[in-house]
UniProtKB/Swiss-Prot annotation:
GO terms for molecular function: ATP binding; GTP binding. Displays ATPase and GTPase activities. This is Nucleotide-binding protein Sputw3181_3461. Disulfide bonds: none annotated. SUPFAM superfamilies: P-loop containing nucleoside triphosphate hydrolases (SSF52540). PANTHER family: RNASE ADAPTER PROTEIN RAPZ. Belongs to the RapZ-like family. GTP binds at residues 56-59. InterPro entries: P-loop_NTPase, RapZ-like, RapZ-like_N, RapZ_C. It comes from Shewanella sp. (strain W3-18-1). The lineage of its organism: Bacteria, Pseudomonadati, Pseudomonadota, Gammaproteobacteria, Alteromonadales. Keywords: ATP-binding, GTP-binding, Nucleotide-binding. ATP binds at residues 8-15.
Length: 284
């Protein structure tokens, strides 16, 4: 089992790091007291081999010896990777001033500046024990995400799941689409009597549309558009991308185009899913 422990001063980016880990398939728990880690791992044993927790200053032992002892009591075979995120006092003060959030130690009737300094002192033992110390003072959320992925995977790239969805405009547009393309201008198999009862999944319809230069040109241009911008979308902390293709009824053209695009992007670089809204509704 792999366990990632994320600690650090509040406002330094622990939540960002935890979101990255969640996207990588980790079971994430925020602000878990260290004595409960062993119980958590026992409960997840056999069901999830990737676990990540963030540790709050309020859950940290005062002495580093206690911390080491608690970690040594974890189940045998646990592979631990630890991060400590930190920023300068000036940057943390600025971030808290901008978000107007309450610092975890502010309830002790101390000023924000005093709370930030106190937290740094309390977390100092932890900062000396971790595997990876990251100063986020000059990092934005994308830079930090890249660093976490680079450490865990050896690469900043993340697997983007692409959904191609066909639909019919007469039944409304899908609300979850990131990109939407209207193919109602393409030649319509509906007007071919032999093709009317078929769908874009059937070979006769596919052959008809494949013979249309306009159809092939459109698919080629959409493919180029997506190939150009996918790397930038992947770097933007996206986990998935939904591309909707719509025709009038969602039976012929949109189905065929969605299938063709899905085939072209099923090249091992991306995880691709294709769904046909109107055809799925007809089966239900």
């Amino acid at each position: 089992m792999k366990l990632v422990i994320v600690s650090g001063r509040s406002g330094s980016g622990k939540s960002v790091a935890l979101r990255v880990l969640e996207d990588l398939g980790y079971y994430c728990v925020d602000n878990l007291p260290l004595p409960l880690i062993g119980s958590l791992l026992e409960q997840l044993k056999g069901s999830n081999d990737l676990v990540a927790i963030s540790v709050d200053v309020r859950n940290m032992p005062e002495q580093d010896k206690v911390l080491v002892q608690q970690l040594s009591n974890l189940p045998a075979g646990t592979e631990i990777t630890s991060f400590f995120l930190n920023s300068s006092d000036k940057v943390l003060l600025k971030r808290y001033s901008e978000t107007r959030r309450l610092h975890p130690l502010s309830k002790s009737r101390v000023s924000l500046q005093e709370a930030i300094k106190l937290e740094g002192k309390l977390l100092e033992p932890m900062s000396k024990l971790v595997d990876h110390y990251i100063d986020t003072s000059n990092l934005n959320i994308y830079d930090l995400s890249d660093q976490v992925r680079q450490i865990l995977l050896g690469s900043v790239d993340k697997e983007l799941v692409i959904y191609f969805e066909s639909f019919g405009f007469k039944n409304g547009m899908p609300t979850e689409a990131d990109f939407m393309f209207d193919v109602r201008f393409l030649p319509n198999p509906h007007w071919e009597l032999a093709l009317r009862p078929l769908t874009g999944l059937d070979e006769p319809v596919a052959e008809f549309l494949n013979r249309q230069p306009l159809v092939n040109k459109f698919i080629w241009q959409i493919e180029n558009l997506l190939e150009t911008w996918l790397p930038h979308l992947e770097r933007n902390n996206r986990s998935y991308l939904t591309i909707a293709i719509g025709c009038t009824g969602g039976q012929h053209r949109s189905v065929y185009v969605a299938e063709q695009l899905a085939k072209r992007f099923s090249n091992g670089k991306h995880k691709v899913n294709v769904r046909h809204r109107e055809l799925d509704h007809a089966k239900a």
